Amino acid sequence: MAEYKNIVLLKGLENMEDYQFRTVKSLLRKELKLTKKMQEDYDRIQLADWMEDKFPKDAGLDKLIKVCEHIKDLKDLAKKLKTEKAKVQEKKKGKCKTAGKKKGQDELSSSESLFINKESYKSVPSSKKKRKQITKTEGGKKKKLTQEQAQLPETSGTNIKKEEDCLQNPHKSPPTPSSSSSNKAPRRGTVPKEPSREEGHHQGPKQVMVLKVTEPFTYDFEETKRMFHATVATETEFFRVKVFDTALMSKFIPGKIIAISHYIGCNGFLEIYRASCVSDVNINPTMIISNTLSESAIATPKISYLLSQAKGTFVNGEFVVFKKSERHECICYGIGDDTGKMAVVVYGRLTNVRCEPGSKLRLVCFELTSTKDVCLLRSVRHSYMQVINEGKPLNPDSVRRNSLEPYF
């Protein structure tokens, strides 16, 4: 089932550290019949695909839970996986009950319909059945219909065609609007302020136009893993994309229309792992993206707007740095605009980026969080940071003040 595979990949394998993932592969090697090369080369998506093939009933979810229960650092993850599995099973039971109830209603409805039709026929006056009908033939002459013909319903060519259409295209009731709007495409005429979200595996293809791309960068120095970020759009919405195959830089050219398939939606991003997931659009490669949509997709949010957003939101934008403070394991920057200011905390590899007050920073995939009642942006594993220009140091008093004392 697709639900089980989503749990295995998105809730399980994607939440493991690299060492933990390698441990799981090792412990499942015999049951999955992994060769040495497969064990070394398979990434999380490939392993999830292989588990689905080997255990089609639950995509190997039970096997993964048992393995996680034997690994000290993954016991909490095993509990979460059990909870997610229970949710799917409960949902499935609910669907079965609903289907059984609907079947009974349909059978009752059919019986009622048959009864009504019979009663309707009985209620037709006998004088009406026996009355001879007069109609015109194609030649204009009048023709009398026999009693038997008069009793039959009209079957003109038009009516026959309508009946055939009804049989071939049964009437469908309009879909009931979903209570959740997270996966809805915006209506034409409305310009979204936030990227659209999709969750789980999507086969596609989805045709999009590339709007903006970062340079490729190394996000894991130990295993030399590289990636780049992109912003793409359809005519009605835009998406943020993580691309984990840097060979695809040749496809992600601003203004180019491409088709993406077999991508994974996760935490507000579309994730692409293989070059085969992206292809050129050769037939009618035209897409009209409005200027307002393009501007909204790449716009920098105001600080006041960020302060109102939920924790866990990922932020892209270009901000002016007015203050810097170096710590033992991180660097804290103060960024601001005419609506307020905020702290940005960077860790690991991004502490090697040289940036001084007065410069403008481009931030991509920074997580909004808070500590000590102060909102801030922090770097995560896939964050990207670039100094756009080095300006003169700013006067901190020229930027509206919020409390940043815990960081400076």
Swiss-Prot record:
Gene Ontology terms: biological process: activation of innate immune response; cellular response to interferon-beta
Keywords assigned: Nucleus
Cell compartment(s), UniProt: Nucleus
Chief location of this protein within or outside the cell: nucleus
Biased composition (Polar residues): 150-159
Domain of life per record: Eukaryota
Residue ranges of every copy of the HIN-200 domain listed in the record: 190-388
Tissue: Constitutively expressed in the thymus, bone marrow and spleen. Isoform 1 and isoform 3 are present in liver (at protein level).
Renumbered residue ranges of the record's region Disordered: 84-208
GO CC annotations on file: nucleus
Pyrin domain ranges (all copies): 1-87
Compositionally biased tracts (Basic residues): 92-102
Family: Belongs to the HIN-200 family.
Matches recorded under PANTHER family: INTERFERON ACTIVATED GENE 207-RELATED, INTERFERON-INDUCIBLE PROTEIN AIM2 FAMILY MEMBER
Protein name: Interferon-activable protein 203
Organism: Mus musculus (Mouse)
Taxonomic lineage: Eukaryota, Metazoa, Chordata, Craniata, Vertebrata
